[in-house]
């Protein structure tokens, strides 16, 4: 929801309200919902042409709580350069973490190993704050973030070709 810039509708007996996904998540297992509200709808805006997205998470076993995850959305201009990028991590802080500095490094860049590596390193080394768990140390979570970011960015860039209208 955060990577796709969704809007969320909260409903209660008092009525409804819409809020952007960036304002919905407040911390670890905490949202902006009041005690009498429930999440009733998630509205995803249409993706622009030449946009690709990917979500990758890593867990020890299928269905387990992920040690790290990343959602990536990239939009290319007519020349194949990155016009917009969003990277959002899960289990990288006390809530979903947007890596805006890493996304900024992709702006104006073509798909290249160096651009992907720069973004992955920026996010893993400077933007996320993994807390660790019984399954993964913070250092291992940073390593996972770097690897998953590379994979997700390559997948998202590849998927832009199928939305080239």
Show which residues each predicted segment covers.
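C-terminal structural segment of proteins
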Residues: 1-165
């Amino acid at each position: 929801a955060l990577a796709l810039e969704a809007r969320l509708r909260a409903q209660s007996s008092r009525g409804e309200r819409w809020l952007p996904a960036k304002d919905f998540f407040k911390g670890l297992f905490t949202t902006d919902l009041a005690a009498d509200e429930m999440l009733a709808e998630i509205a995803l805006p249409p993706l622009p042409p030449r946009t690709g997205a990917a979500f990758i998470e890593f867990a020890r076993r299928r269905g387990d709580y992920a040690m790290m995850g990343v959602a990536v959305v990239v939009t290319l201009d007519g020349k194949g350069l990155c016009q917009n990028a969003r990277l959002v991590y899960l289990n990288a802080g006390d809530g979903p973490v947007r890596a805006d500095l890493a996304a900024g490094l992709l702006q104006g860049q073509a798909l290249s190993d160096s651009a992907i590596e720069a973004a992955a390193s920026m996010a893993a080394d400077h933007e996320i704050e993994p807390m660790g768990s019984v399954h993964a140390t913070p250092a291992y979570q940073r390593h996972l973030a770097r690897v998953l970011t590379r994979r997700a960015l390559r997948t998202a860039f590849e998927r832009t070709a199928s939305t080239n209208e």
